[in-house]
Each structure stands twice: as structure tokens, then as C-alpha cells.
């Protein structure tokens, strides 16, 4: 029983970390969009290299 509880706690922790990482990524993307000088920058592919969050 204790092992199952430990596994559930670890899983919950990992899911929480994953959600927080995605939220940080989305916040960075939003900020990057706000910081763009013009729509032309978007079409030049200047948003993020490889379209990924670091």
C-alpha cells in the first residue's frame, strides 16, 4: 500500500512540474508575441527557433 501511495505522490509531482513547465512556455510565447515589432517578424520565422520553447 505504501509503495502505491509513493508512486501516486511521485506521479502527481511530475504532472504538476509538467503543467508548470507548459505554463512557463506559454507565458514566454505570449511575451515574445507582445515584444514583436511588427507582423513581418512573424512571417520571417523570428518567433522561436525550431518552434520550440527552451
From Swiss-Prot:
Pfam families, A to Z: ELH
Keywords: Amidation, Disulfide bond, Hormone, Neuropeptide, Secreted
Keyword Secreted: yes
Cysteine disulfide links: 25-53
Taxonomy, superkingdom: Eukaryota
GO biological process, one term: neuropeptide signaling pathway
Modification Leucine amide, positions: 36
Compartments reported by the entry: Secreted
UniProt GO molecular function: hormone activity
Function: Injected in sexually mature animals califin B excites LB and LC cells of the abdominal ganglion and cause egg-laying.
Similarity comment: Belongs to the molluscan ELH family.
Protein name: Califin-B
Originating organism: Aplysia californica
Amino acid at each position: 500500500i505504501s509503495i502505491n501511495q509513493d508512486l501516486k505522490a511521485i506521479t502527481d509531482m511530475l504532472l504538476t512540474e509538467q503543467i508548470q513547465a507548459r505554463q512557463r512556455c506559454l507565458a514566454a510565447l505570449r511575451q515574445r508575441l507582445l515584444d514583436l515589432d511588427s507582423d513581418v517578424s512573424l512571417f520571417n520565422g523570428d518567433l522561436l527557433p525550431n518552434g520550440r520553447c527552451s
